């Protein structure tokens, strides 16, 4: 018997207007209901094609299908981290504590230096993509990486702890072409408790995505 599981859109852990004034309710609703849902649908469509291929019911362009799966599945995964990585003003923002603060100081020198490097990474993604903070288990270190689109330039073994979407759909309705202001304001809603939980999972050899 050949089967593949299907992905579903996770609910947001807060209301669509909860991140205002930094991210508008209109952006959040469109981003979640349309864009994220589109990545879920795209991943499931690719899986359906693969399932039919494995059953001998259809021929496919394997390269194209796997490219689609990589793009849409990574879009789904990154957004599933992005939403809980944020919290309403007052609950999000500020400086981290706990182990994540210790490791940020160890690998970046200070929170201020980390924030500047991460912001520059986000502002300078070429085209569309993400800035991410990862725990890299091979050398047990924190790294800041850029992802182009959803699936290019990512370290294969890295556990994503913090993700910032810099596709235009994440900010354009509110910030127009001013990605820099969006990135600067995003720090006011970063959920450091969520980042800490992901780090603790990664340090214990567990999957940081599953909280």
From Swiss-Prot:
<keyword id="KW-0560">Oxidoreductase</keyword>
<dbReference type="InterPro" id="IPR036314">
    <property type="entry name" value="SOD_C_sf"/>
</dbReference>
<feature type="binding site">
    <location>
        <position position="31"/>
    </location>
    <ligand>
        <name>Fe cation</name>
    </ligand>
</feature>
<dbReference type="Pfam" id="PF00081">
    <property type="entry name" value="Sod_Fe_N"/>
</dbReference>
<feature type="binding site">
    <location>
        <position position="165"/>
    </location>
    <ligand>
        <name>Fe cation</name>
    </ligand>
</feature>
<protein>
    <recommendedName>
        <fullName>Superoxide dismutase [Fe]</fullName>
        <ecNumber>1.15.1.1</ecNumber>
    </recommendedName>
</protein>
<feature type="binding site">
    <location>
        <position position="79"/>
    </location>
    <ligand>
        <name>Fe cation</name>
    </ligand>
</feature>
<comment type="function">
    <text>Destroys superoxide anion radicals which are normally produced within the cells and which are toxic to biological systems.</text>
</comment>
<dbReference type="InterPro" id="IPR019833">
    <property type="entry name" value="Mn/Fe_SOD_BS"/>
</dbReference>
<dbReference type="GO" id="GO:0004784">
    <property type="term" value="F:superoxide dismutase activity"/>
</dbReference>
<feature type="binding site">
    <location>
        <position position="169"/>
    </location>
    <ligand>
        <name>Fe cation</name>
    </ligand>
</feature>
<comment type="similarity">
    <text>Belongs to the iron/manganese superoxide dismutase family.</text>
</comment>
<dbReference type="InterPro" id="IPR001189">
    <property type="entry name" value="Mn/Fe_SOD"/>
</dbReference>
<dbReference type="InterPro" id="IPR019832">
    <property type="entry name" value="Mn/Fe_SOD_C"/>
</dbReference>
<dbReference type="InterPro" id="IPR036324">
    <property type="entry name" value="Mn/Fe_SOD_N_sf"/>
</dbReference>
<dbReference type="InterPro" id="IPR050265">
    <property type="entry name" value="Fe/Mn_Superoxide_Dismutase"/>
</dbReference>
<keyword id="KW-0479">Metal-binding</keyword>
<dbReference type="GO" id="GO:0046872">
    <property type="term" value="F:metal ion binding"/>
</dbReference>
<dbReference type="Pfam" id="PF02777">
    <property type="entry name" value="Sod_Fe_C"/>
</dbReference>
<dbReference type="InterPro" id="IPR019831">
    <property type="entry name" value="Mn/Fe_SOD_N"/>
</dbReference>
<keyword id="KW-0408">Iron</keyword>
<comment type="subunit">
    <text>Homotetramer.</text>
</comment>
């Amino acid at each position: 018997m050949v089967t593949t599981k299907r992905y579903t859109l996770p609910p947001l852990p807060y209301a669509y207007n909860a991140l205002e004034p930094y991210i508008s309710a209109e952006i959040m609703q469109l981003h979640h209901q349309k864009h994220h849902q589109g990545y879920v649908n795209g991943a499931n469509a690719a899986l359906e094609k693969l399932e039919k291929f494995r059953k001998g019911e259809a021929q496919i362009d394997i390269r194209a299908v796997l490219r689609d799966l990589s793009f849409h599945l990574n879009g789904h995964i990154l957004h599933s981290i992005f939403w809980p990585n944020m919290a309403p003003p007052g609950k999000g923002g500020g400086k981290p504590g706990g182990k994540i603060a210790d490791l940020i100081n160890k690998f970046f020198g200070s929170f201020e230096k980390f924030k500047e490097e991460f912001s520059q990474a986000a502002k300078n993604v070429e085209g569309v993509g993400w800035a991410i903070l990862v725990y890299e288990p091979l050398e047990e270190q924190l790294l800041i990486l850029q992802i182009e689109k959803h699936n290019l330039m990512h370290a294969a073994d890295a556990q994503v702890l913090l993700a910032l979407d810099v596709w235009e759909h994440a900010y354009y309705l509110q910030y127009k072409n001013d990605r820099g202001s969006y990135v600067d304001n995003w720090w006011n809603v970063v959920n450091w408790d969520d980042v800490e939980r992901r780090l603790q999972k990664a340090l214990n050899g567990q999957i940081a995505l599953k909280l």
